[in-house]
């Protein structure tokens, strides 16, 4: 049985934009966070791809990864993930081949099947209105070919890209990617940081369908976990109200800019909204290091996950840094 000490800890940054803040400051904060978690001992630092969201500045994922990798030295950096329906596989192979050539052995390519946007935004990204997600298995295979060794009959190559073998991960919040990752023998990351409902079933499907590959000889599961760590449980509960407001705004279709914490959420949400936010954040680790350690031990006992990737969207950058520092204490025992 796997123990908490056997599990790797990583970071997922949505590059949040705060109220009265700017994308430029958010991007600088992202690098500062990457530098800190590198020192804290985290395994990897991933950024997501989101479009047309005023509170998230990680839309140009590949460009941002170059900035992050250039400002760090040992931590792995990667996409969590590139939404493949938005892109031609060749372009992604060239972008990540370039990153791997510049920062060898430090680049991860996490792939998602959803567009990460609405239909209007998807059209603005120059893709078909519908159906592109159905091409995901073929697109993943094509991308893997571009990153693998060149074959004698291969007419189109990614340069850089060919032969770099950038590690591919499949990401998802449903059972589709879980089964595909298992069948392809790829590592699998489940988006339990916002969709924990099918977590246990997705892990089971992935492991049941797993076939050893040149990449993995046994399944490898990563789980997304929302994080709000503070010195006391009371302080963590207070800081978490910024997260609650953000999720509530997402559900209402409102602005996603980060708002400062409040003393109480009473009057800000309706009972059914409070329940919905609670479901969204069902796996959230909110509290002191002692409380979080106990909850993580239960999570690992139940899932036997190999790695946890934590996302922490607090209003003050200093509170985010401190949250990951406290979690590092849990990680190191």
Which residues fall in each region the model found?
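Acidic (Asp/Glu)-rich catalytic clusters
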Residues: 2-5, 38, 65-74, 100-107, ...
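Conserved, mostly hydrophobic/aromatic
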Residues: 9, 37, 41, 49, ...
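A conserved active-site cap/scaffold subdomain adjacent to cofactor or substrate pockets
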Residues: 178-197, 202-203
């Amino acid at each position: 049985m796997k123990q908490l000490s056997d599990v790797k800890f990583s970071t997922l940054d949505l590059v949040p934009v705060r109220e009265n803040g700017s994308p430029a400051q958010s991007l600088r904060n992202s690098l500062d966070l990457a530098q800190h978690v590198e020192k804290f001992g985290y395994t990897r630092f991933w950024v997501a791809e989101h479009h047309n969201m005023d509170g998230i500045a990680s839309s140009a994922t590949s460009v941002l990864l170059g900035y992050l990798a250039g400002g760090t030295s040992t931590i792995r950096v990667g996409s969590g993930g590139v939404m493949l329906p938005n892109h031609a596989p060749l372009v992604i192979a060239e972008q990540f081949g370039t990153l791997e050539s510049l920062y060898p052995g430090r680049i991860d390519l996490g792939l998602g099947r959803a567009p990460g946007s609405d239909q209007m935004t998807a059209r603005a990204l120059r893709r078909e209105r519908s159906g592109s997600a159905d091409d995901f298995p073929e697109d993943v295979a094509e991308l893997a070919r571009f990153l693998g060794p060149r074959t004698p009959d291969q007419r189109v190559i990614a340069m850089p890209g060919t032969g770099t073998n950038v590690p591919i991960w499949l990401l998802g919040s449903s059972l589709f990617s879980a089964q595909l990752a298992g069948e392809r023998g790829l590592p699998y990351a489940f988006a339990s940081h916002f969709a924990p409902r099918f977590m246990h079933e997705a892990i089971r499907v992935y492991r049941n369908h797993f076939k050893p590959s040149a990449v993995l000889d046994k399944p490898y599961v990563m789980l997304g976990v929302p994080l709000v760590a503070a010195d006391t449980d009371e302080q963590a509960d207070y800081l978490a109200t910024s997260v609650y407001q953000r999720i509530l705004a997402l559900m209402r279709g409102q602005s996603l800019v980060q708002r400062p914490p409040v003393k109480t959420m009473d009057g800000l949400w309706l009972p059914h909204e409070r329940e919905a936010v609670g479901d969204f954040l069902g796996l959230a680790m909110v509290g002191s290091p002692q409380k979080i350690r106990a909850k993580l031990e239960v999570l690992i006992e139940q899932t036997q996950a190999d790695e946890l990737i934590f996302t922490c969207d607090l209003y003050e950058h200093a509170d985010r840094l401190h949250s990951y520092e406290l979690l590092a204490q849990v990680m190191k025992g």
